[in-house]
Regions:
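Surface-exposed amphipathic alpha-helices with a cationic face
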Residues: 16, 42-47, 68-71, 92-100, ...
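A structural signal for isolated positions on well-ordered beta-strands in alpha/beta enzyme cores
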Residues: 53, 80, 105, 141-143, ...
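Hydrophobic, well-structured mid-protein blocks that either form specific transmembrane helices
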Residues: 64-114
Length: 209
């Protein structure tokens, strides 16, 4: 194991020391579940030189504005807008219009290929139709994540969606994760147009070094 610490900053430092990585996807689960934002943790990561992509459960423009009261948004590498936090499709364009200068990533959250949605207004939308809405809204990056693959080491399940985004919008940054277990998996993601990969378990247990 890289570290026996559960402190986020110490974990991040251990990963940076071992692999040289300084960009982190940070999911603040308390904030996602409508609790407080761990602004002290975010600030400590930024202060130590880490680039933070933050998912704090922001699903509309007012929530992004509220996040700015806890975190300096301009200090972040980007704010993540997760599908499971967005109640209405039209909110994606409204968020991006209001915060046009803020780097923003839309995360297509799936479970076994099925979109994880917030409320009934997303019913009937396929993964590709949701991606179309995010791209038309002007999202800077797209994150593709099938939660059924996370931590399982069974390979990535989002390759067809990576292909789709790159076909529709070649200049949009595409990041995917879940199930990455080897360098070969990373090469495969690159072949499907991915610009980045979310990796955790394979770093912690030494499968990737």
């Amino acid at each position: 194991e890289l570290t026996d610490s559960s402190d986020p900053l110490q974990v991040a430092k251990a990963i940076r020391s071992a692999f040289g990585y300084s960009t982190f996807y940070v999911a603040d689960l308390d904030a996602i579940l409508s609790g407080p934002v761990h602004s002290d943790v975010i600030s400590s990561l930024v202060k130590d030189g880490f680039d933070v992509l933050l998912d704090a459960g922001t699903g509309d423009a007012d929530q992004v504005d509220g996040l700015s009261e806890s975190v300096k948004l301009n200090d972040l590498a980007g704010v993540i807008i997760g599908l499971e936090s967005v109640p209405k499709p039209e909110y994606l364009s409204l968020i991006k219009q209001r915060f046009s200068d803020l780097p923003m990533a839309f995360s297509l959250d799936l479970m076994n290929g099925v979109p994880i949605t917030h409320g009934d207004l997303w019913q009937g939308y396929s993964p590709t139709s949701i991606l179309d809405i995010a791209l038309e809204a002007g999202m800077d990056s797209i994150i593709l994540l099938d939660l059924a693959s996370v931590g399982m080491g069974t390979g990535n399940r989002c390759l067809e969606h990576c292909d789709y985004v790159k076909m529709r919008a070649p200049d949009v940054n595409v990041i995917t994760g879940g199930g990455v277990r080897s360098r070969e998996d990373l090469y495969e993601l690159e072949a499907h147009g991915c610009d980045g990969a979310l990796v955790a378990s394979a770093l912690h247990d030494g499968r990737l070094s």
